[in-house]
């Protein structure tokens, strides 16, 4: 229990200001009163309510507690659409819970910041999209906020100011378990939960969605678990003060359709109407179809055509995402090789399963999915900061190469498809070795184990608002 300190003649601490602000609507005169109010015996409160129903026997109280322990548990996943990877990881975790545990858990995915707070927290998506288009600005923001004293001061001020709103967001869903899949969703909710006395009552875990380089805001010593996608990230967690018992290295959570669906390449090609006999390269532009997609596609159109024999040596599939202008431009081009131009796709496991290699920027989710499919990877760009470390993660493990040049990219693919098929095969084997297809299932099973250990009726149910 938190020690109660009588008010002294001094300026209020941030914690006291937060409590005074949060509980001003409940006629609680002081922070001390609220601490005392929250420290009442939970057994006393349960029995008081049960007496009103005529259930005064302690055995019946224990029976009710056991029933509460077996009820459907609520999992709140905190995320933000700052890049597509956070939502994808959240949805992968949701789907894995459903596959493994059926209706035992109710999964809610929310951007609590966007729905309950004000600026700047509710505007992170727009700010992120602006900064990644100006990579120099993003690099300054990423590295400038990395020192602990800077981001802790900034986040603690936001936590104090928006404590009431964040509490309301958490209270609405009454979670038994909170999962953060975003670097800015550790410190603030954990501080607010601690100020409320909830940090020992609700399981809070972090699932890191960056493969190698990651921001220090991912790490908070107050979590029950920190799930790291690689040993490199786990080492950073230890350096930042987490205990070894809090850390698990399972890999990056990807959609269960990747590891759990057995896909035959020829059957997929028939379904997707792709040539069965030509090797295929998958060119990704991300959800927004960004990067040098058009230049790379045109270069591949030339390099994969054997002008001497007047026939193609490979075929191209381009995923343009939501970029309709790009899709229209490529679709209207006269190609000398088989080309499929697609928009936003929801079944990427099929397109990856039908191809022989992939060209993409260094997004962690796409890399993890490609590794599971055994695809050699050509990385053609990265966002400074969190994606930079993904390049050596792929290249140093022999699963791919890096080049920003569309012409060089096209040359590498043509070489793989003609004179250097052994290198393509070796990289495919290395990709499979590096993959962690069961990561999302290992994560949800471990969270379930934590939940079983903490059989309890959540403190959220002890208060009515």
Swiss-Prot record:
Notes on activation and inhibition: Inhibited by galvestine-1.
Induction pattern: Induced by phosphate deprivation. Induced in rosette leaves when grown in acidic soil.
Phylogenetic classification of the source organism: Eukaryota, Viridiplantae, Streptophyta, Embryophyta, Tracheophyta
A Pfam family assignment: Glyco_tran_28_C
Name this protein carries in UniProt: Monogalactosyldiacylglycerol synthase 3, chloroplastic
Amino acids binding UDP: 86, 255, 365-369, 387
Primary residence: plastid
Catalyses which reaction(s): a 1,2-diacyl-sn-glycerol + UDP-alpha-D-galactose = a 1,2-diacyl-3-O-(beta-D-galactosyl)-sn-glycerol + UDP + H(+); 1,2-di-(9Z,12Z-octadecadienoyl)-sn-glycerol + UDP-alpha-D-galactose = 1,2-di-(9Z,12Z-octadecadienoyl)-3-beta-D-galactosyl-sn-glycerol + UDP + H(+); 1-(9Z-octadecenoyl)-2-hexadecanoyl-sn-glycerol + UDP-alpha-D-galactose = 1-(9Z-octadecenoyl)-2-hexadecanoyl-3-beta-D-galactosyl-sn-glycerol + UDP + H(+); 1,2-di-(9Z-octadecenoyl)-sn-glycerol + UDP-alpha-D-galactose = 1,2-di-(9Z-octadecenoyl)-3-beta-D-galactosyl-sn-glycerol + UDP + H(+)
């Amino acid at each position: 229990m938190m020690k109660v300190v009588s008010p002294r003649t001094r300026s209020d601490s941030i914690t006291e200001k937060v409590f005074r602000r949060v509980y001003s609507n409940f006629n609680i005169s002081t922070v001390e009163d609220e601490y005392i109010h929250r420290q009442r015996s939970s057994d006393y409160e349960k029995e008081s309510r049960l007496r009103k129903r005529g259930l005064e026997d302690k055995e019946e109280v224990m029976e009710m507690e056991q029933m509460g322990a077996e009820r459907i548990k609520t999992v709140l996943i905190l995320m933000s659409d700052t890049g597509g990877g956070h939502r994808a990881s959240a949805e992968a975790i949701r789907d894995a819970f459903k596959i493994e545990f059926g209706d035992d858990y109710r999964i809610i995915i929310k951007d609590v910041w966007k729905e309950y707070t004000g600026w700047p927290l509710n505007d992170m998506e727009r700010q992120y999209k602006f900064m990644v288009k100006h990579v120099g600005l993003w690099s300054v923001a990423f590295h400038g906020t990395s020192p602990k004293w800077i981001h802790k001061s900034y986040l603690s001020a936001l936590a104090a100011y928006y404590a009431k709103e964040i509490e309301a967001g958490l209270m609405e869903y009454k979670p038994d378990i909170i999962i953060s899949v975003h670097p800015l969703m550790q410190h603030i909710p954990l501080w607010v939960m601690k100020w409320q006395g909830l940090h020992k009552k609700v399981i809070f875990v972090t699932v890191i969605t960056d493969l190698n380089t990651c921001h220090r805001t991912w790490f908070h010593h107050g979590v029950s678990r920190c799930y790291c996608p690689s040993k490199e990230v786990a080492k950073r967690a230890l350096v930042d003060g987490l205990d070894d018992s809090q850390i698990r290295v399972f890999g990056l959570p990807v959609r269960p359709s990747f590891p759990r669906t057995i896909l035959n390449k020829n059957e997929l090609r028939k379904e997707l109407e792709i040539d069965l006999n030509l090797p295929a390269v998958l060119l990704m532009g991300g959800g927004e179809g960004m990067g040098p997609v058009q230049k790379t596609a045109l270069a591949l159109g030339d390099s994969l055509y054997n002008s001497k024999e007047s026939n193609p040596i490979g075929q191209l599939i381009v995923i343009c995402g939501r970029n309709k202008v790009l899709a229209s431009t490529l679709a209207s081009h006269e190609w000398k090789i088989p080309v499929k131009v697609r928009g936003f796709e929801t079944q990427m496991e099929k397109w990856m399963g039908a191809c022989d290699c992939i060209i993409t920027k260094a997004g962690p989710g796409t890399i993890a999915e490609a590794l599971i499919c055994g695809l050699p990877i050509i990385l053609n760009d990265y966002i400074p900061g969190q994606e930079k470390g993904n390049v050596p993660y792929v290249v140093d493990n022999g699963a791919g190469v890096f080049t920003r040049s569309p012409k060089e990219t096209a040359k590498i693919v043509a070489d793989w498809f003609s004179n250097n098929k052994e290198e393509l095969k070796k990289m495919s084997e290395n990709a499979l070795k590096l993959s962690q297809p069961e990561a999302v299932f290992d994560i949800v099973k471990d969270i379930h184990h934590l939940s079983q250990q903490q059989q309890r009726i959540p403190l959220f149910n002890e208060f009515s608002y």
